[in-house]
């Protein structure tokens, strides 16, 4: 079972931010999708880091599929498309602000849609969660609670870790959301 952020752990790989994980009621409050609640810029960031691994995985899945089957053809087509998306994601500088800007384009939004693909999305989100865990381990935090993972995801890994230090526990923090988002689904 994968812990899903922003849903008390009960969300799914296709969970949309703002939609209740059990009743499926509500209105989307952002582009955040899935276990890791990836924003479009996160999807671009993760694809630029791990895209080749995903393409190879799709090709391996195709090789293991029945020869000449629709599934094999579908996976091969998907691998070609994902390779193209990976090249595009890597064509921009590896900077968060550039990923945010690119995420607002049609191509950037198309890349974000890979989260909804059953062969790509769940794994992309798990890789994002694993990255948070690895960052925490490098900082000496071996075990994280769901809330701590959520904080790192929301604030950014480094800032999230800083916010968990004793000095930061009493410091004021930024409100990451627009006020209207709090009232939209009540």
Predicted segments with their positions:
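Catalytic glycan-binding domains that act on GlcNAc-containing polysaccharides
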Residues: 1-183
């Amino acid at each position: 079972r994968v812990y899903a952020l922003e849903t008390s752990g009960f969300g799914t790989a296709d969970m949309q931010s703002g939609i209740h994980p059990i009743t499926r009621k509500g209105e989307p409050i952002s582009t955040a999708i899935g276990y890791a609640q990836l924003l479009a810029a996160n999807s671009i960031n993760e694809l630029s880091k791990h895209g080749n691994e995903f393409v190879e995985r799709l090709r391996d899945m195709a090789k293991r599929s029945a020869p000449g089957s629709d599934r094999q053809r579908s996976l091969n087509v998907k691998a070609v498309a994902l390779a193209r998306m990976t090249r595009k994601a890597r064509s921009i500088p590896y900077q968060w602000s550039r990923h945010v800007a690119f995420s607002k384009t049609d191509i950037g939004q198309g890349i974000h849609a890979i989260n909804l693909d059953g062969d790509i999305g769940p794994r992309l989100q798990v890789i994002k969660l694993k990255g948070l865990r690895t960052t925490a381990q490098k900082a000496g935090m071996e075990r994280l609670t769901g809330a701590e993972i959520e904080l790192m995801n929301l604030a950014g890994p480094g800032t999230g870790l800083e916010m968990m230090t004793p000095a930061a526990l009493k410091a004021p923090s930024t409100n990451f959301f627009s006020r209207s988002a709090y009232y939209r689904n009540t």
